Amino acid sequence: MLDTNMKTQLRAYLEKLTKPVELIATLDDSAKSAEIKELLAEIAELSDKVTFKEDNTLPVRKPSFLITNPGSQQGPRFAGSPLGHEFTSLVLALLWTGGHPSKEAQSLLEQIRDIDGDFEFETYYSLSCHNCPDVVQALNLMAVLNPRIKHTAIDGGTFQNEITERNVMGVPAVFVNGKEFGQGRMTLTEIVAKVDTGAEKRAAEALNKRDAYDVLIVGSGPAGAAAAVYSARKGIRTGLMGERFGGQVLDTVDIENYISVPKTEGQKLAGALKAHVSDYDVDVIDSQSASKLVPAATEGGLHQIETASGAVLKARSIIIATGAKWRNMNVPGEDQYRTKGVTYCPHCDGPLFKGKRVAVIGGGNSGVEAAIDLAGIVEHVTLLEFAPEMKADQVLQDKVRSLKNVDIILNAQTTEVKGDGSKVVGLEYRDRVSGDIHSVALAGIFVQIGLLPNTHWLEGALERNRMGEIIIDAKCETSVKGVFAAGDCTTVPYKQIIIATGEGAKASLSAFDYLIRTKIA
């Protein structure tokens, strides 16, 4: 199961264990059970602190295994294979169960230990999903820390019957005590806040006590991270606030055009950005979104950022780097069937539609790449492009046209998502040449029609263009003195990671120049 290199790395990690770990497998006669048994036996051979045993009498999913301590039943459970992107989740679960501390803030760990109530979480994942590990790891950690919290991470490919019964059409999909809890990427802080209902109020009260910053950066993607590093290096009081560190990068799989880094993955780059920021004196505020900008009443005064949690943060200068999100089709049925067949991540959710018919909306690079990827998994792909021709690179167009199970429809305006009340069953589109309406029967719709800037919260506060992008000049200055902007949320052309980081650095330098030239009001 594990090659020599993986065994060497895992053996080194297991040396960090400070207390014994027991792997308890519940298996059947399936090939997947044999695979898991082999994997667990290999892991146990790598450390004298790890033991493996079978107990096939337990009333749990088969195949599955519990990671616990001898004499205990507390800890995370994996149902199915924890390989692919989830192998890291397995390694971390072993470390945490074996006494190696988590790197999360101590205050957050104590909050988890103090959660009152019984919670049984179930998370469905796919081995190709790059968004799933964050959720699986967060809930695994909670199960290690609090005996009243249980978590089972379930491989959707192994338990396809449950995927069908529960209408899971997007991963990660989380259930708690048998009811839907959430879908898509969630941070540990976000999950804890949903479980601990008083957490948001306490967080807002704590934020309100923060002193004013010299520069407050709103958005923790590449632009925000670069701005934070450049600002902190100037020795000024720097705050960095965001919903999730890494931003849109977290939803990117392969990155091959970030100069000096020939190839990496979105999660790895986001982790590197976070590690770089942590090297400096930056007050990082996670899982917080801005709801309003209140510009300073006088030049040199304090600007205010109101958060969705009800807090108010103040700063002499602001850098807005809130990035962008996937653009919606804005047609009937899209909202109703979101995560029930309407999805935005082919890498995460593609395996859930194995052997089914799907559509991809959009003929740009993202859409054509999605169609190519999906063609190897699903029965058939229908690619719909609004314009008379696709806008993807020619090499991608040539590739997708060579695939026998992909149909391309141009001049197609999607008009409605069709469903049966619980899941997608098809879509309708209008031929923009003839005006005729056509129906396509399918199970999934992958929307790939570009990005929308995350600037809705700035309505009336500063100038934006008709696309919602913040209008900036060559120095990243906005229409409000002391407020700067950088990255995908601005009018800067070409939405690229490397451009966003450069713009973040530029915005930071401009903000510093503003601070040293402006008297404090």
UniProtKB/Swiss-Prot annotation:
TM spans (from-to): none
MF terms (GO), sorted A to Z: flavin adenine dinucleotide binding; NAD binding; NADH-dependent peroxiredoxin activity; thioredoxin-disulfide reductase (NADPH) activity
Xref: InterPro entries: AhpF_NTD_C, AhpF_NTD_N, Alkyl_hydroperoxide_Rdtase_suF, FAD/NAD-bd_sf, FAD/NAD-binding_dom, Ferredoxin-NADP_redctase_2, Pyr_nucl-diS_OxRdtase_2_AS, Thioredoxin-like_fold
The protein's Enzyme Commission number: 1.8.1.-
Binding-site residues, FAD: 214-229, 478-488
One Gene Ontology CC term in the entry: cytosol
Keyword Flavoprotein appears in the UniProt entry: yes
Amino-acid positions noted as binding NAD(+) in the UniProt annotation, renumbered to this chain: 357-371
Pfam (any one): Thioredoxin_3
Cysteines joined through disulfide linkages: C345-C348
Keyword Thylakoid among record annotations: no
Keywords assigned by UniProt, alphabetized: Disulfide bond, FAD, Flavoprotein, NAD, NADP, Oxidoreductase, Redox-active center
Cofactor(s) annotated in UniProt: FAD
An annotated GO BP: response to reactive oxygen species
NCBIfam families the UniProt entry points to: AhpF
Extra remark: The active site is a redox-active disulfide bond.
PANTHER family found in the cross-reference section: THIOREDOXIN REDUCTASE 1-RELATED-RELATED
Role of this protein: Serves to protect the cell against DNA damage by alkyl hydroperoxides. It can use either NADH or NADPH as electron donor for direct reduction of redox dyes or of alkyl hydroperoxides when combined with the AhpC protein.
Name of the protein this chain belongs to: Alkyl hydroperoxide reductase subunit F
Source species taxonomy: Bacteria, Pseudomonadati, Pseudomonadota, Gammaproteobacteria, Enterobacterales
